[in-house]
């Protein structure tokens, strides 16, 4: 059986998700015995392959060059996986979509005639995405599990409907497994009830409220949580700022206009 050729690459981001992959240590090295690394800049400067069975793309397509590269990667791959919050949601960069973008440009760049300043969107808005592994950074164990399952998909000729799925449950589920004290009940602005689990709840476990880096559950109704946070004394502006952090606000309230 031929080894599947895999690329792990990035657009505009901090590349922290790729660091999380390397945190697998020896397990990642063992994984490379089952796959061919066609492109991974953390290991080799230049790609070894032009076509890929699976490409993992971290980061958001912020520039025209990013978008062209994303389209090119899609054409050259059988399966495309969005890797991390920036790729799945827009991520930290999307915060500027909720501000006066032109004003922010003038604040950062004192003397400039023009600059690319588009709205920040997830990969799925530009190309077909076969699977999303969310998080900031990703959960390395989830990545390893997905890669192993994708190898089976390719080697056994399975259909896209038989692709591995990310479990749909709230972060509260992970907290309960860890017997964590509920931060929402302690008065902290935790988004756990409406956000996707799978991260193993490291933030609530450390006493830090979930701020939604894995994105919202599908078809979630955030209004009850919003009312609870208002009752606890948080202003709507404070709540919105938390939801804006990873681009979650636009995901759960897509009808809201972003600022130009």
Language model feature labels by segment:
Residues 1-56, 61, 65-79, 102-260:
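Iron-sulfur (Fe-S) cluster-binding modules
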Residues 99:
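Short beta-strand elements at the ligand-binding edges of bilobed clamshell
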Residues 96:
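Portal/gating segments that form or line small-molecule/metal binding sites
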Residues 86-91:
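Short gly/pro/ser/thr-enriched loop/turn and capping motifs at secondary-structure boundaries
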């Amino acid at each position: 059986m031929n080894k599947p050729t895999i690329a792990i690459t990035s657009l505009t981001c901090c590349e922290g998700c790729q660091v999380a992959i390397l945190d697998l240590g020896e397990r990642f090295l063992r994984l490379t015995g089952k796959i061919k690394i066609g492109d991974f800049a953390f290991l080799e400067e230049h790609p070894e392959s032009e076509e890929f069975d699976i490409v993992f793309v971290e980061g958001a397509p912020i520039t025209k060059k990013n978008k062209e590269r994303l389209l090119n990667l899609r054409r050259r791959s059988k399966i495309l996986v969005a890797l991390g919050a920036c790729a799945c949601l827009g991520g930290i960069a999307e915060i500027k979509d909720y501000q006066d973008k032109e004003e922010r440009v003038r604040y950062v760049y004192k003397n400039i005639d023009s600059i690319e300043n588009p709205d920040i969107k997830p990969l799925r808005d530009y190309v077909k995405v076969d699977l999303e592994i969310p998080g900031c950074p990703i959960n390395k164990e989830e990545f390893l599990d997905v890669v192993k399952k994708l190898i089976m998909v390719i080697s056994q000729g399975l259909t896209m409907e038989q692709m591995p799925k990310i479990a749909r449950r709230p972060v509260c589920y992970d907290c309960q497994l860890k017997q964590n004290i509920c931060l929402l009940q302690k008065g902290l602005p935790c988004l756990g009830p409406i956000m996707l689990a799978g991260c193993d709840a490291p933030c609530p476990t450390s006493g830090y409220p979930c701020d939604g880096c894995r994105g919202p559950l599908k078809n979630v109704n955030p209004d009850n949580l919003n009312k609870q946070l208002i009752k606890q004394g948080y202003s709507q502006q404070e709540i919105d700022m938390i939801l804006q952090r990873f681009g979650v606000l636009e995901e759960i309230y897509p009808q809201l206009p972003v600022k130009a």
